[in-house]
A protein has these predicted regions:
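Eukaryotic intrinsically disordered, low-complexity regulatory linkers and tails enriched in Ser/Thr/Pro
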Residues: 1-77
């Protein structure tokens, strides 16, 4: 499966992702980041709340399609 970041700047095979992390940063936004090498992390998506970020991260790991696109937030900013 290929994972596409929310802004479509990154496309990586899920097999290269060592782990993902959801953390609050970036002016209160919640970031979903993927570690693809021991010293390289990629921001996959930004969400206004932790729930959306955790849901998107979980859905990526459960996806059985050829591609996973991180959804845009449904919450108004």
């Amino acid at each position: 499966m290929i994972v596409r970041s929310q802004n479509h700047h990154e496309s990586i095979p899920v097999s290269r992702i060592l782990r993902t992390k959801v953390e609050q940063k970036d002016h209160g936004n919640w970031l979903v980041t993927a570690t693809v090498e021991p010293d390289r992390a990629i921001v996959l998506a930004r969400y206004p709340n932790e729930n959306e970020a955790l849901t998107a991260d979980t859905l990526m790991w459960l996806c059985e399609e050829d591609f996973y696109y991180f959804p845009v937030s449904v919450e108004k900013r």
